[in-house]
A protein has these predicted regions:
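Short, surface-exposed amphipathic charged segments that create phosphate/polyanion-binding patches used
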Residues: 35-47
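Short, polar/flexible loop-turn hinges at active-site or ligand-entry regions and domain interfaces
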Residues: 18-23, 46-50
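Acidic/histidine-rich catalytic cores and adjacent linkers
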Residues: 2-18, 28-35, 51-211
Length: 211
């Protein structure tokens, strides 16, 4: 979502008639921001509860809820759900924000048209404003600033996961090649390593039938 990068890509597309592309803000970068906003509130609420609750109550009902809070609700086991219910008794604002976060995640997980996504996101923003869920104000601002690019995700639901995974592999290989000075040698090593990974990856067998 860096403006400099987005502007550079837009300029390139505008200057090349043979390039047809749709700019998309990756959904995982979007999720990172609204989850960070939720986490900011979580820290504030944990600090408040530690000051207000008796130590034994805090230890029993609040401590140890970090990972259950960070997990998607559908991935929680029964024990984790019980822990969150106990926590939310003392932190209704956190419960409200948790529910809004899960509703937003559900929107991005749902297969739908761009128009449907627009309606659901608009409804979510209205709900945030109506409930005065101030922790999400930074995200709502980002959502408004990059509205079209975020909505574009729902056209094909494509993410940059493959590219980022490839970049991680390249960084790992580059660290192993410390001391290599010639760029051509480094690129040869990258090519050999990545090609080897492709050839050693188990592949599904296909049968071609002829009539």
């Amino acid at each position: 979502m860096w403006e400099g990068y987005l502007n550079a890509v837009e300029e390139y597309i505008a200057e090349h008639d043979d390039v047809t592309a749709r700019l998309v803000v990756d959904r995982f970068h979007v999720a990172q921001q609204y989850r960070d906003d939720f986490d900011t509130l979580r820290k504030q609420e944990m600090k408040r509860l530690k000051q207000e609750l008796p130590p034994e109550v805090y230890a029993q009902d609040v401590k140890g809820t970090l990972w259950p809070l960070r997990k998607n609700h559908q991935d929680l086991d029964e024990e984790e759900r019980i822990r969150l219910r106990r926590l939310f008794q003392y932190a209704p604002r956190l419960h409200q924000a948790y529910t809004l976060r899960e509703e937003l995640t559900a929107i991005f997980n749902r297969a739908q048209t761009m128009q449907q996504a627009e309606r659901r996101l608009t409804s979510w923003i209205s709900k945030v404003e109506r409930l005065n869920a101030t922790c999400f104000r930074p995200f709502v601002k980002t959502l408004s600033s990059h509205w079209t690019l975020i909505i574009n995700y729902f056209a094909d639901r494509v993410t940059s996961g493959f590219v980022e995974g490839l970049n991680n592999k390249i960084r790992t290989i580059t660290r192993r090649c410390y001391g290599i000075r010639k760029p051509s040698t480094l690129f040869q090593r990258l090519w050999l390593d990545l090609e080897a990974r492709l050839f050693t990856t188990p592949r599904r067998a296909f049968t071609l039938s002829t009539t």
